[in-house]
Amino acid sequence: MVHVIDEETRYEAVRSRDARFDGEFFFAVRTTGIYCRPSCPAVTPKRTNVRYYATAAAAQTSGFRACRRCRPDAVPGSADWNVRADVVGRAMRMIGDGVVDREGVPGLAVRLGYSARQVQRQLTAELGAGPVALARAQRAHTARVLLQTTDLPVTEIAFAAGFASVRQFNDTIKTVYALTPTALRAAAPRRGTARPTPAAGIPLRLAHRGPYRADAVFDLLADEAVTGIEEVGGERGARTYRRTLRLPYGTGIVAVEEAHHDSATAPGGGSSTEAVHRGGWLDARLHLTDLRDLTTAVQRLRRLFDLDADPYAVDERLGADPRLAPLVAARPGLRSPGAADPDEFAMRALVGRAGAARLVARYGKVLDAACGTLTHLFPAPADLAAEPGTPGALAAALADGSLRLDAGADRDDAEAALRALPGLDARTVALIRMRALGDPDVALPGEPEAAVDAWRPWRSYALRHLAWRPPADS
């Protein structure tokens, strides 16, 4: 599914500063040389001076620099990239996961099953920017986060953000932000007396679009938490989710907060702990053994917490169904969480919570320095391939690459490979497709066909509405 937004709707969104469209498109002003998010608080430009772009990278490629007031590089990504199963959607998910930084455009093309020239042509034709420009925009954003939230030396930040040289880093920052790295750091809004050191972790604001039902996500994570790699602590409404992460260059530990100062009581009453975030972010802190993993770690957290979803489109569609309408009205912004590690989730979906804890205790790599109850990494597929039966077969398929569940995997191919494994039932396969592959349009076996068709293309969200029962409803 592709959001087709006509020019009149776009300009009206800019004129009314409509945050619902942040990340769905960007606009640039010819007379100022600046590009913005639709909700930018600056004076509305004349229609004749406005240009529209599908991505920040396209605006940058056209010579526009990021607005310092609205920081368009910090908005949630378009929900289309989660929905779409075509080459452009898959490419955008992989670029977000850092594939171009690690493997270059040839590596991206191999993963997509196309030539590098075909990938360049398709992305440029639709998005106005090729894979290099898209990755460059992402590197610039990562660098800004590190410059403005840590006291790391500029040289370390350049390589941590994925730049090949300090000169390339300096040139990109000047082009995108019209500031030197030092000036960009000095322009950071102050949230305290001093920036944290790397040992204290990197503070993050994980932006989301529209209302966000944080309590439902944290309820699910608490129910699923596996001893040794995850924990959820604190009172409901003010919980902290913590987990270990296996990343391309090293390991990480993240803490994500449920509470947010912009939270509001859910419609229809309910306690203050059943908060709906009304647009904004989740606060997080990330500890990494290798800072080159920052971009990948952030993208995996965004998928786990479903932060790039479009709750307005989801709620409009599902709210038209009589069965779901009262649930949607009472729970705006309900999300369909994904997975921080798709391979890990597939194994957990198969063996269950207790089985996963057993695998962690037996095969998991022990952290060099335990952090409270977080003591292990979940075992890599190769470490589990000797397990008997279906778990071993699943692990072997993941390890040898015959089954791919990464951000850019073809969902239909992955489902076919899962179904070919002995002992995986249809419900487990559907759950893996929904959570590990991040498919927003999955129906579990047993739902009435007519109802399921009415929920397209958001069937995964419909199932979350039907499955989740907050304590007051139980």
Residues of each region from the PLM?
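HhH-family (HhH-GPD) DNA N-glycosylase catalytic core used in base-excision repair
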Residues: 1-474
